[in-house]
Every structure is written in C-alpha cells, then in structure tokens.
Amino acid sequence: MIHQYFAACPKGLEGLLLQELQALGATDTRETIAGVYFNGDLNLAYRTCLWSRLANKILLPLANFEVNSQEDLYEGVRMLPWQDHLSPSGSLLVDFVGTNDAIRNTQFGALKVKDAIVDCLRDFSGVRPNIAKRDPDLLVNARLSKNKLVLSIDLSGESLHRRGYRLKQGSAPLKENLAAGILIRAGWPEVAAQGGALLDPMCGSGTFLVEAALMAADIAPGLGRASFGFERWLNHRNDLWLTLREEAHHRRKLGLAKVNLPEIRGYDADVRVVRAAEENIISAELDHWLRVSRKELAEFKKPTHRAMDYGLVLSNPPYGERLGEIESLKLLYAHLGERLRNEFPGWRAGVFTGNPELGKQMGLRADKKYKFFNGTIASELLMFSINTDVFVQSRVEQDGRFSKDEVERDAAEQKVKAAAKEEQAAALSNGAQMLVNRLQKNRKQLEKWARKNEVSCYRLYDADMPEYAAAIDLYLGQTPPNRAPQLYAHVQEYAAPKSVDEARAAQRFADIEAAVPYALDIPVSHISYKQRRRNKGSSQYEKLNERPTGDLFSVQEGQAKLHINLWQYLDTGLFLDHRPVRHMIANMARDKRFLNLFCYTATASVHAAMGGARYTVSVDMSNTYLNWARKNFALNGLSEARNRLEQADCLKWLENNDQQFDLILLDPPSFSNSKRMEDILDIQRDHVEMIHNAMRSLSEEGTLIFSNNLRNFKLDLEALGAYNIEDISARTIDEDFKRNPKIHQCWLIRH
C-alpha cells in the first residue's frame, strides 16, 4: 500500500534530501522547509530509515485537523484507531512541537495528546499503556502550526543522525547528517568514484571521515543503530525489515572488500580529540580503512605513502565570536589557504564555516558557496578549485607586491598568447581559413541553443564543406575532482574516397589540424583527432593510444554525469545524436523496470536511474564498456544493487530471459561480427526477430524504444503488424544534428 511520508531534515538539506529520496525510489516528492514529503510503500519507508544519510526523522502522517481549543486537540486525537498501532499494554511517548492561542505550551500539548491516546486504548481494552521517556513501543509526533495539527507515527525513533558509532565528540561536533550533506555538496561521491582521497586537517571527532567512508564503501548509515521506532509498532513487517538489513550487510561486505577504496585521513592538533576520533572509527568498525593522527596545521601536506594525484580537502575550522578569537581565526584561515595553495594544486577544497567572511583570508577565490544551518548558526560551505587562476592575495599578506607581480605576469602571458595567435593565423591556408570561418559561424549559432537547453556537448560541424569531410564535437568537461569546466574537441575525419590521392587527403587533414585549435581557441592537448572506419571484430574496443587516464573527464547531461574518453577508443562513451532519446527515457522511467540492450557505456541506464526507475538492467558483450558503465553509475552515486550490469550476447540473453520490463531500449549496431557472438548481426536482416524477442520481455503496458543508425534501414511494418508502432525519428534529432537527419531512426513500439 502506498502512503505519504514526511522526511524531516536540517534546514539547507532539503534539496539534497529530495534527490536522495528519489534515488531510493520515492515518488511524488515535494520539498518544504526542513523536510520533504514523499510517497511510497512500507518497504520504502524502512529503506529510507536505513539508508538516508540526510534525514532526521521519517514520519507517517495519520491525520491533520484544526485545533482552536484544548477540546479540539483531545477529540481529534482520541477518534483515531490507536488499537491498530499500539498494544494496550505497550509503552508510549509523545513528541509535541508548536503552539497557538489554545495550546500555549508544548508540554501541555503532549499531555493532551497522551491522554487522548490512553483513553482511547483503555476504552477499547480496559488496559492503559505505559508512558516511556526512552525507547517507547510507539513514538507519536504532533506538530502544531498556527491552528493546524499534523499527527504522525515516528518510524525512525531516535533521530536518524544518531548512527550509533559516535562514542566521543569534540567541543562543537557536526551532526552526522549535516556532515553527510556537506560531503555531498563538496562533491565527495564523485571524487570517491574516481579513487580520489579525502583529507581533513582539523578532523575533530572524525565525523567527516566516518561519513565519507560510509559513502565510499556503500554502507547504510543506519546499519549500526540499535533500534528504530517501527520495530514494536503493530503494523511492523519484520520480514521486509530483515530482508533490507541482509541486503545492507551484503552491500557493506562488498563495499569494504573493494581494492580501490579511497584514502581517507584526518589530522588534529589536539591529541584528546584524535583519541576521540579513533574511538568513533573503531566503533564504526572502519579502523582498517581510516587513519587519524595528531598534526599541526603547519605540518599539513599531501601524504607520500601512496600516490594521490587528486582528492578533496574538507574541514570545519573552529568558530569564534569574540574579537580576539576572530583575529586568531583570520591567521588560521590564511595559513590553511597557504597549505592548500602550496601542497594541493589540482585538488578541490571545501571549508564549512559559521564565519564566511573569514574565507576571504585564504588567498583563494571560492567558485561555489552553499548555505547551511549548523543548529541555529547560519553557515556556508565554501568550495575552491586549487589552481593558480583562483589564487588571490590574502588579506594578511604584508604588502601589495604579490598583486602587482601577478598583474605583470598575466599581461606578459596575454602578450605571448596574442603573438602566438597571430602566427597561427598567418600559417593558415586558404582552405583552413574557410574552415575556421565555418566553425566560428556554427559555434555562434549553436552556442545560444546549447545554453538555453543546458547542453554541454554538441556537434559543431558535420562535413558541412565536402572537401573537409569530418565530424567535430565539442565537450565542456570537468576533470576530477570537479575542477572548473574546460572545452574539448573531438575530430573524426571520414576516410577519403579512393579517388582522392593521399597527398591531397593529407593536406586536407593538416588544414583541419590547423583550423580547429585556432577557431575554437583551445590548446592542442584538448583536441582528439581520429579517422572513422568500419571496424571489424574486437578492434572497435581496442585502445587507440595509451594517453594517461588523468585526461579523462566527465560531462553533465540533464541530471546525469557521464565519463568521457576522447583519446583511447574510437568512440567517446557518449553518442551525442541520442541525447533526446536519453532525455525521453529519463522522463519515462519513473517506477519503471528498465532494460538497456547493447547498452554501450549504459548512459541511457544512468538517465533512467536518475529519472526514478525502479531498477535497471544493462546488457552488453564488451567488458570494456561495462566497466565504463560501472564508473558512470558510481559517478552518479547509483548502486549496482538496483542497476545490474550483465556481460552477454544480447540476442542470446533475450532468447533466455524470463523477466518482464516496462521500458526497453533496443539500440543495436548496424552490423557486428564479434568473435563472442555466435552469428553475424545484420540489423536489416535480423531486426524483426530481435524486436519479437524484445516484445516478449515487455510488460503489457510497456514501451520498447527501437533505434539504429543504418542510413538506408527499412522497418518491416508488415512483419511487425501485431504491434502499435510510432515513428519518432524527427522528434529525436536535436538542433546540432539537423544537418544530418538520417543520423539515426527511432520508433516507439507497444503491444
């Protein structure tokens, strides 16, 4: 049965909590102050109690009514069937929040609610329940706002931020769910997915460290709690709960068994605080993976025991209110900025502070600021990309020479750059100059469309000039961990026909190589050049070169973040022409069972999962692409428990499948003779049988999306006459591919 629930959280976490609930499977989510309403079944409520890193409470509303008098409150509560929720011999506790003219004291309000419940149960059975101040059988939550009371069962019991691992704490500890929200805002899930490290130079009792490890190892935050509020509720389903706990224990085991768990380390100058952090880490059973040690901030630097090319430095420095404390903190912030600039180039850094103005002392320019509340203290998370173009003069530096030098250095660099640009222009051939003009014209036209539609990757040029037969795609990518976006270009030169001699073909390619960096004003290192040919067998999966993986980056497409590799394979990991299809899948996927056949890097599955799919299954024969898909899921914080990847011949898999799916994407290659396939795949010849098999796996009300890139493909409508078929090809061609409307064809097929 579907119910509406309310997840309470600290102010500032509402948007993140909404996304988390959607990822857990919640529907009809609605954000409000300090919480999110959502719909789901009891299994989802249990899952949320176990897996939410951000919520304080999960409440099941029973009733809401007007309260204009004490009698209204008593009668409104008493009329509910409390015998359905609590045994008359059980124990009860009421949590009452809010006042109005009739109920001026929360203790009095709690007493009236308690009296009404007790009287109801006594009238029903002749027995009255006990009142328990700790660990009751039923915790009732009553919230009065103006004259409206919302009465709920508190399924969580003790606040969910109490994970169970914190035995000791520092002088001003962060609540665990606030720490988790800060980590998410700081981009830790993405950094961890890339194998980046987390370092906290002022770790206190280790809350950031433990919460970061729970995320990286896929450990449910509620797994260490002693109890929840629903366990002695009369409607409790212990079978559901035990299944969820077993799943969580299994995921924890798998997560901690990973050989590539990120490095997580903390430091603090106070040895007593370090000991408290160590005890908490042991309590969380993470002492084999987390390390804390006593270290002054002045000693803070990148560890050398293993390679750490990138990562996240995250800290919550001390707060101060008195003048002397503020002045000391200015120096502390300045020193922290110096440590970051000197020791962690290329990293990301986050500083959570109740004194945001102090961030200006760090000599770094924050690229993002997020507002939070630490209890009642308005706070901010300041995020920094640690590279020279965000370095600014610290307010505590003694004079202005640094600023003057930097201005002079920048002017010199601009002068050199301008001279190099002039040299490039002089070296362009007439043909290359024509190509430059076309690229710049196309970019001007497409950039407006791309910005309006939040498109970060698009096709700039597709053999617009026949003598320069190439496709040029632009990618606005972020290298880990979330550095400032940079522009990259992917150039695919189509093989010249035999009628064009090799010398002329070579000259045209040289023109392209000269024109692209000049027209786009990007470094050559950001451009990948390839020649597109029809590949055979496994060659389509072979690496083209051994360029370091550090050059990989991610792009944002809708809600999804996707890994891109411009250099090592023929394709980049993302087929740009299918962008509208992926967006369509994201919009169609909520609560659907999604199957992705010939899934490639599973980008459509990521969109489906981010769109609220019940679960996804992605099938492909290439282990290379499935590993890539795993990275895409991890990049978006999506678990393989609900997003299964299967290495198989898709045709054989379909023949043997007995599962039903509500949404299927069938996007096969036009031709394949891979050694792993028993037969050669020819899409024109084989599509009817393939679609019939896919339709057997489609639920009665489901939708099959069938697409392919064979230019002269003809769908056999007569052989597929039993189905409802809609050609949506025109709707799946975006602005950047309108020059080539035959880039793919696409149909919706239903029973």
Curated annotation (Swiss-Prot):
The keyword rRNA processing applies. Keywords: Cytoplasm, Methyltransferase, RNA-binding, rRNA processing, S-adenosyl-L-methionine, Transferase. One of its GO terms (cellular component) is cytoplasm. GO terms for molecular function: 23S rRNA (guanine(2445)-N(2))-methyltransferase activity; RNA binding; rRNA (guanine-N7-)-methyltransferase activity. Residues 44-155 form the THUMP domain. The keyword Transmembrane helix does not apply. It is found in: Cytoplasm. Its EC number is 2.1.1.173, 2.1.1.264. It holds the Pfam family UPF0020. It catalyses: guanosine(2445) in 23S rRNA + S-adenosyl-L-methionine = N(2)-methylguanosine(2445) in 23S rRNA + S-adenosyl-L-homocysteine + H(+); guanosine(2069) in 23S rRNA + S-adenosyl-L-methionine = N(2)-methylguanosine(2069) in 23S rRNA + S-adenosyl-L-homocysteine + H(+). PANTHER family: RIBOSOMAL RNA LARGE SUBUNIT METHYLTRANSFERASE K/L, RIBOSOMAL RNA LARGE SUBUNIT METHYLTRANSFERASE K_L. Belongs to the methyltransferase superfamily. RlmKL family. Specifically methylates the guanine in position 2445 (m2G2445) and the guanine in position 2069 (m7G2069) of 23S rRNA. This is Ribosomal RNA large subunit methyltransferase K/L. It comes from Cellvibrio japonicus (strain Ueda107).
